[in-house]
Amino acid sequence: MLTRKQHELLLFIHERLKETGIPPSFDEMKEALDLASKSGIHRLITALEERGFIRRLPNRARALEVLRLPDSIAPGLNAQKKFAPSVIEGSLGKTPPPPARPAPVATNDDTSGTVSVPVMGRIAAGVPISAIQNQTHSLSLPPEMIGAGEHYALEVRGDSMIDAGIFDGDTVIIKRGDSANPGEIVVALVDDEEATLKRFRRKGASIALEAANPAYETRIFGPDRVRVQGKLVGLIRRY
């Protein structure tokens, strides 16, 4: 999944290539996305390239090629000029969900003796990505696996937590909550936009989101930029 800004940049590049055959400049991309500096564009392009959406052509200035578009925006692309992507909402973000329908939570299934846990989408164990706001399906789990409280599940994408035994394709079970102890693995919401699965640490007054893979750097944020959305209590792996 892509963040809102990644979606916007990908579509902006695609539309510019379609109209002129020439990729936009970094200044044009910065202005289009209303970013303060070009370093933000560099990070977005790197993330899009890592996910296989674009490719930078070597030895050519401003050479970008769009390899694919997300399934959510590919249909009817020519009929719309601006895409309004889904971002984290409700208890996984800053925008409250529609009042007519409460957010799904784990519920008891009296007929089978299991607990139904909603799968809410995907979570990055790598570069942060937006979590899907809608329930995709549910898992039936034994009550002793998760204990009391409200829970949801997320599918892991990325390899930054492999040393903690969490691999790409695993499903993590998260207990909802807005606090965590140092060393616990949490779903962290960064800047009310991006969700990531990382180990929670405190560095003085700041919050550190620590990977369990030496290839990834620990990211440090001010306390007002990070909100805990729940902590890891279980993991499911299919073979």
Swiss-Prot record:
It comes from Brucella anthropi (strain ATCC 49188 / DSM 6882 / CCUG 24695 / JCM 21032 / LMG 3331 / NBRC 15819 / NCTC 12168 / Alc 37). This is LexA repressor. Residues 26-46 bind DNA. The record marks 125-126 as: Cleavage. It catalyses: Hydrolysis of Ala-|-Gly bond in repressor LexA. Homodimer. Its EC number is 3.4.21.88. InterPro entries: LexA, LexA-like, LexA/Signal_pep-like_sf, LexA_DNA-bd_dom, LexA_repressor, Peptidase_S24_LexA, Peptidase_S24_S26A/B/C, WH-like_DNA-bd_sf.
